[in-house]
Amino acid sequence: MARRCELTGTGVLTGNNVSHAQNKSRRRFLPNLCDVTLASEKLGRGFKLRVAAKALRSVDHVGGLDVYLLKARDEKLSDKALKIKRDLKKAMAA
């Protein structure tokens, strides 16, 4: 399973641990991923997604999963999130 947020596309970054003596050793910065079920008001059901904690705060800030997906750019969303977004647009059009 990839270490990537399904809503923001946040993934693993690499860098250095730097000691007081300026010795450098390679390290990885992992995203804070959470397995959560987010509810869609328009579709009337929940969706299991693997998202970063920052993305959860963003979803709360804008007012829910539906609003977040409609505002999000398609390049950042996973295939699963894109399918939810398409279903959401169909439900709103009907």
Curated annotation (Swiss-Prot):
Keywords: Ribonucleoprotein, Ribosomal protein. The keyword Membrane does not apply. One of its GO terms (molecular function) is structural constituent of ribosome. GO terms for biological process: translation. Belongs to the bacterial ribosomal protein bL28 family. This is Large ribosomal subunit protein bL28. NCBIfam families: L28. GO terms for cellular component: cytosolic large ribosomal subunit. The keyword GTP-binding does not apply. It holds the Pfam family Ribosomal_L28. It comes from the Bacteria. The gene is rpmB. PANTHER family: 39S RIBOSOMAL PROTEIN L28, MITOCHONDRIAL, LARGE RIBOSOMAL SUBUNIT PROTEIN BL28M.
